[in-house]
Amino acid sequence: MVVNYHNEPSIDFTDSKNVESFKEALKKVKGELNQKIPLVINGEEKFTKDTYQSINPANTTEVIAEVSKATQKDVDDAFEAANEAYKSWKRWSHKDRAEFLIRVAAIIRRRKEEISAVMVYEAGKPWDEAVGDAAEGIDFIEYYARSMMELADGKPVLDREGEHNKYFYKPIGTGVTIPPWNFPFAIMAGTTLAPVVAGNTVLLKPAEDTPLTAYKLMEILEEAGLPKGVVNFVPGDPKEIGDYLVDSVHTHFVTFTGSRATGTRIFERAAKVQDGQQFLKRVIAEMGGKDAIVVDKDIDTDLAAESIVSSAFGFSGQKCSACSRAIVHKDVYDEVLEKAVALTKNLTVGNTENNTYMGPVINQKQFDKIKNYIEIGSKEGKLKQGGGTDDATGYFVEPTIIANLKSSDQIMQEEIFGPVVGFVKGKDFEELLEIANDTDYGLTGAVITNNRENWIEAVESYDVGNLYLNRGCTSAVVGYHPFGGFKMSGTDAKTGSPDYLLNFLEQKVVSEMF
């Protein structure tokens, strides 16, 4: 019997017992760092001579793992294994595949502290963010297991005299999962196991910055008894195997979360039919955002400031849904800005091993990019708070507020993916929405207002996939807030939704005459 779905709880770190328990998990994980991570192809580990290092972004002298690098030949072997495994995996009943996922979720639940501790070191996640990431991974897995059972019998269609008709779902084949580093467990696990529970097989190419977190899932899948070849683990250099994975004649689908540049490249390459290819490839992509919180007049300015600060600086602004733009009515602009600055001054930044509010950004490339945007923004507007950067021991960037910007300014148009928020003023609600929509992206947004008519207008006109009232624009919850965006934010294939598994299924009709 499968119990009703509910969200996995976080860990209450106001309880000293939980703090001590998590410190023990951190100590244990720290003692196991600098381990060697293999490829996993057809259930067999393969260690390669050519490797790269995953490092702690909060302490760049600390090596997290030595990671084997897959070659194109390894990818070929992985496709061969996945194609062979597909022959039997697709014949598992919907119920058996769903029950397998529930077993996986149970193991993750038991190892939640360990997985969270890995993310503290490998992704620089604060404790709450790391635990939330692991918990969300459990949520995705539990939710998709139940979704598969609901789809097991297909959907009803009409019969007529002498004719019985069935409409049902079947898996589509082998695909590729390319997850991001910012939610290295939740998104990775969800985008890998959604196609798997639907009966497909997968090549998982983990994010280069967080391979150990992804390898933990491989350990768990083996412990749960996943048949060989259903999920194959192929870390490697995207320049060598990225296009190769997408272009392969064996690739039926690609699930991708990451940058716009890479996402659009995947779309372009997947559209080309290769020699011998007998199907059209599907691309399920989430490509970021330039998310905004719109603040109306006559509102609770404390709520507005708190929503902006938490959405802009949680996990150092490295969320696809992070608030990068604060679009504020002129009547409350100065007050909201002042309160946001005051709140930001109290945020702690440092090594997240010590449970700071903010940790590092993920790598040198991102650090340099964010630093450059701060310099640009300081010229375009007025630096009100933060702006400091330090990469002496880790990739640390102060939470930064830049005011007096125009919607057309560079830092108001381009995705920064760091702890930087720009403030812009609007004369009325209509202009606030115009500014909010003045972007290529359409992922998340929030509106702080007490005016019901303005909220109704925002629901109709604010062009984002996830819109929130009187709260921040981050923290979508699986099963409650299916997540995905419009425009250049991706394909709006809402993760954690009743429809998500349909991306990995074909619809078949069988008509019997009597």
UniProtKB/Swiss-Prot annotation:
**Keywords from the UniProt entry:** NAD, Oxidoreductase
Species of origin reads Staphylococcus saprophyticus subsp. saprophyticus (strain ATCC 15305 / DSM 20229 / NCIMB 8711 / NCTC 7292 / S-41)
Please provide the Gene Ontology terms (biological process) for this protein: glutamate biosynthetic process; proline catabolic process to glutamate
Assigned EC number: 1.2.1.88
The gene for this chain is rocA
Q: Name one GO molecular function term.
A: 1-pyrroline-5-carboxylate dehydrogenase activity
Instruction: Identify which residues the record assigns to the active site.
Output: E286, C320
Question: Pathway it acts in?
Answer: Amino-acid degradation; L-proline degradation into L-glutamate; L-glutamate from L-proline: step 2/2
For this protein, what reaction is catalysed?
A: L-glutamate 5-semialdehyde + NAD(+) + H2O = L-glutamate + NADH + 2 H(+)
Q: What is the similarity comment for this entry?
A: Belongs to the aldehyde dehydrogenase family. RocA subfamily.
**One GO CC annotation:** cytoplasmic side of plasma membrane
Question: Would you tell me the protein name for this molecule?
Answer: 1-pyrroline-5-carboxylate dehydrogenase
